[in-house]
């Protein structure tokens, strides 16, 4: 597995302790929000510093953000592909889901409204994860 240090340097950024700490956290725990990252990281990194690091990593293409409906931005290191997300309505767990194999139908809108070079679609499926489903069965 590629390390945070390698990813940062490969993107042409200077490898700093805050960048490595944030990226290490996202490599092991994807889909975190900035407040979740802030509470998990050393207190030496200010909130503004955290947002600066996230913005640097996002602009360098190492991290991407997405916002499920009703949620603040979440960050992940899975970039460069067109994947989507399953979100549990009960516990909030988020799981990556690959787009269709071959030519993704989700990249072919019925009406492109004059847009060109359409290269990404965001799809979020909502449901109940297996853990919550099993828990609900046990409560019946």
Report each predicted region and the residues it spans.
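Non-DNA-binding regulatory cores of transcription-related proteins
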Residues: 62-140
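Short acidic, hydrophobic short linear motifs in intrinsically disordered regions
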Residues: 32-41
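Short capping segments at the starts of secondary-structure elements
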Residues: 17, 29-33
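Short, locally clustered residues in the helix-turn-helix/winged-helix DNA-binding domain
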Residues: 24-28
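Basic amphipathic alpha-helical segments that dock to polyanions
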Residues: 50-62
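Short alpha-helical segments that sit at the start of domains
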Residues: 1-23
């Amino acid at each position: 597995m590629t390390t945070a240090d390698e990813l940062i340097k490969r993107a042409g950024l200077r490898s700093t302790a805050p960048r490595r700490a944030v990226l290490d956290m996202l490599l092991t725990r994807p889909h975190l929000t900035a407040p979740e990252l802030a509470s998990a990281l050393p207190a030496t990194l200010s909130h503004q510093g955290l947002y600066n690091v996230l913005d640097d990593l996002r602009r360098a293409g190492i991290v991407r953000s997405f916002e499920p409906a009703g949620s603040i931005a979440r960050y992940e290191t899975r970039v460069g592909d067109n994947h989507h997300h399953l979100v549990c309505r009960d516990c909030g767990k988020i799981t990556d889901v690959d787009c269709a194999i071959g030519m993704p139908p989700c990249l072919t809108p019925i009406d492109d409204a004059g847009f060109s070079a359409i290269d990404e679609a965001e799809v979020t499926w909502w449901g109940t994860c297996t853990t919550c489903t099993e828990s609900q069965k046990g409560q019946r």
